């Protein structure tokens, strides 16, 4: 568990911190066009990819343009031939590593780290059916986490409470509601949206 806690701390710090230049070399790029070996990518201090390709001289040039020493093993990541793909975007997951996105800020940090280490760079956090006040609290927590500067969190997906009893699956029937304006307005207010 201590390894997992260390990963959570590192991932959370990286996501909350200021972007820094990053360079990755010696990767296998895999995308819709196929696979390329010896691939590299360089991003600047704003987190924007400035160049990508193959060829050592060009890699070194772009490293220097963003202030990285291409020989610095602490600044340049050697992918050692591992696959480099665009980051995954997950639009429906409830958590990871024994934590739910309904478990407050710490639960969000742990679950996001669990997804991030497997390549999910952005995520819509799915929240389960609960009493309306709990759902609203969870929406506010997701909103506050996003507003704290977490670019990896795109918003939240509510899996209820507006479900038909006949199709409720594992959802608590006591928490199911009709989508009446009062409840919808409360949820919109919790999200920061104007219910008008």
Feature-to-residue mapping (PLM):
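Alpha-helix-loop-beta-strand connector modules within alpha/beta enzyme cores
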Residues: 145-150, 187
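Glycine-rich phosphate-binding loop of ATP-grasp-fold ATP-dependent ligases
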Residues: 166-176
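Short, charged beta->alpha transition segments
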Residues: 79-80, 108-113, 183-187
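Extended beta-sheet lipid-handling architectures
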Residues: 24-25, 158
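Histidine-rich, glycine-flanked metal-binding segment
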Residues: 3-23, 29-85
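Di-metal (Zn2+ and/or Mg2+/Mn2+) metal-binding site signature of metallo-dependent hydrolases
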Residues: 82-105
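Divalent metal-dependent hydrolysis catalytic cores, especially in the metallo-beta-lactamase
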Residues: 94, 109-141, 151-165, 191-196
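Histidine/acidic residue-rich metal-binding segments in metalloenzymes
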Residues: 177-196
């Amino acid at each position: 568990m201590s390894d997992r806690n260390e990963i959570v701390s590192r991932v959370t710090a990286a996501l909350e911190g200021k972007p820094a230049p990053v360079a990755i070399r010696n990767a296998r790029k895999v995308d819709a066009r196929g696979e390329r070996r010896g691939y590299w990518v360089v991003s600047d201090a704003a987190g924007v990819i400035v160049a990508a390709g193959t060829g050592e001289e060009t890699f070194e040039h772009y490293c220097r343009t963003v202030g990285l020493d291409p020989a610095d093993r602490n600044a340049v990541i050697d992918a050692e031939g591992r696959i480099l793909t665009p980051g995954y975007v997950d639009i429906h997951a409830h958590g990871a590593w024994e934590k739910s996105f309904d478990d407050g800020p710490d639960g969000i940090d742990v679950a996001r780290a669990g997804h991030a280490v497997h390549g999910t760079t952005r995520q819509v956090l799915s929240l389960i059916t609960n009493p309306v006040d709990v759902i609203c609290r969870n929406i506010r927590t997701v909103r506050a986490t996003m507003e704290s500067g977490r670019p990896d969190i795109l918003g939240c997906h509510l899996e209820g409470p507006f479900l038909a009893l006949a199709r409720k699956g594992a959802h608590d029937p006591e928490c199911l509601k009709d989508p009446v304006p009062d409840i919808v307005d409360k949820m919109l207010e919790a999200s920061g949206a104007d219910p008008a």
